[in-house]
Amino acid sequence: MAAGLARLLLLLGLSAGGPAPAGAAKMKVVEEPNAFGVNNPFLPQASRLQAKRDPSPVSGPVHLFRLSGKCFSLVESTYKYEFCPFHNVTQHEQTFRWNAYSGILGIWHEWEIANNTFTGMWMRDGDACRSRSRQSKVELACGKSNRLAHVSEPSTCVYALTFETPLVCHPHALLVYPTLPEALQRQWDQVEQDLADELITPQGHEKLLRTLFEDAGYLKTPEENEPTQLEGGPDSLGFETLENCRKAHKELSKEIKRLKGLLTQHGIPYTRPTETSNLEHLGHETPRAKSPEQLRGDPGLRGSL
Ligand SMILES: *[C@@H]1O[C@H](CO)[C@@H](O)[C@H](O)[C@H]1NC(C)=O
Ligand SMILES: *[C@@H]1O[C@H](CO)[C@@H](O)[C@H](O)[C@H]1NC(C)=O
């Protein structure tokens, strides 16, 4: 340790004497494996990571529960990825740099369900990435042994993992219905019956099934998702509140009034907008129906429209 420090001071001293930029000294020092950082064998990497919240409870097909508490890793180029089913996904840079990146790519959150099938495990609320949190979707695929087979980043800070396991090779291994308590199965039966009897629409059917999966604990309710969604930024506010709707409506009404004014001013007849589709009619067809000469001699109208 003392020798290392002496060497560090020597290197700093040398670089201070020469014209080398500050970065040069840094580069030399990091070649030495050091005792301060991530690679300290006495300080396990994982203990340095601070999870934002606890993972969701273990849920889904019972035969997968035995994976809970285990971890599977994959080294790809300079990173080691680690998937701990029903717990987390982490990433560890494999270098001797003192500030090697180690991070949480997601904490077990909820299942993805499609077509009566568990199609993926969502791990969310990972380390910050710009204004969002890193998140990972883990697909379960049939394989000879348990292994993390593939990792990619299809969009920024959203990771896609493939985990192979013999536990999902049976064609019914990931079906949702058999995992449900009987009461929820009866509810599901009723929902299907109502759809068949056309008492509910396909959209209503989707919505009822979603609620049912939330009750089972497979999906999180929108309130439970809120922290993640809010991190999506101001854009995600949209029409969520009545206040926003009123504002948007007021602005659209003003715009319609302005456009109508333009049409009137130029003697172009228009139909009263009763539906949104009429806006298009107003914008394109009516002027086209007029003699083209009138429009051509009127650049002001075209520019404004
Ligand atoms: C990830 O999950 C594993 C397995 O349960 C656990 O030992 C580890 O502490 C977790 N890591 C983080 C950063 O929460
Ligand atoms: C839905 O799942 C069934 C098996 O459960 C399968 O036969 C069918 O092809 C799937 N449909 C779609 C659209 O994925």
UniProtKB/Swiss-Prot annotation:
It holds the Pfam family PRKCSH. Changing residue 126 to S: In MLIIIC; loss of localization to Golgi apparatus. GO terms for cellular component: extracellular exosome; Golgi apparatus; UDP-N-acetylglucosamine-lysosomal-enzyme N-acetylglucosaminephosphotransferase complex. Residues 267-305 are annotated as: Disordered. Keywords: Disease variant, Disulfide bond, Glycoprotein, Golgi apparatus, Mucolipidosis, Secreted, Signal. The lineage of its organism: Eukaryota, Metazoa, Chordata, Craniata, Vertebrata. Glycans are attached at residues 88, 115. Widely expressed. Residues 69-171 form the MRH domain. Residues 176-279 form the DMAP1-binding domain. Homodimer; disulfide-linked. Hexamer of two alpha (GNPTAB), two beta (GNPTAB) and two gamma (GNPTG) subunits; disulfide-linked. The alpha and/or the beta subunits of the enzyme constitute the catalytic subunits. Changing residue 230 to V: Rare variant; found in individuals suffering from stuttering; uncertain significance. This is N-acetylglucosamine-1-phosphotransferase subunit gamma. One of its GO terms (molecular function) is protein homodimerization activity.
